[in-house]
Amino acid sequence: MDVCILTSLEYGDHLLNSCMDECERLGGDVWVEIDGLPDAGTNDDTLYISFLGDYIVPKNHLKKHMYNTHPGPPGYRGWGARLRTLQDNKKQHAVTLHQIDEGVDTGPIIKTEYFPVDELSTTDSIHAQAEVHCLRMVRWLITQYKEGKKIVPSGEQWSGRPMLKKTYIEQLK
């Protein structure tokens, strides 16, 4: 199966390179689209993975095999999950793998992976951990596809209002 990685990372980024390596295990072509979709549009025969990307997929391009690695827990949709984890004095953070739908972090949740946060954690350290966990989610997803396993929602639900990028940047000031 071919894989298209939708991302905001730059070519040469070690995380993007690792993500590409994982996707190559499916045996098809792997390509990267930075902050957008392929010029040819989308198709039902390709696996699309939004890996640390900021792009919102338009409704007319949504496909069955389209997933997002959200670097935050289901309660912190959109931007700034790591900042909200610190503001709310949480003891753990998470990354969430979900199917992409027309909302911002609203698609069926496939898997959530939690990790501890302590008093020494910063937004940068939490994000660095989240990036690694997002890569683990890609590895898991590729393994499921490679082994022919059905991808099913976990039953976990999204909550909270999404934070916009503009709001996140304002709160960092």
Regions found by a protein language model. Give the residues of each.
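One-carbon transfer enzymes
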Residues: M1-K173
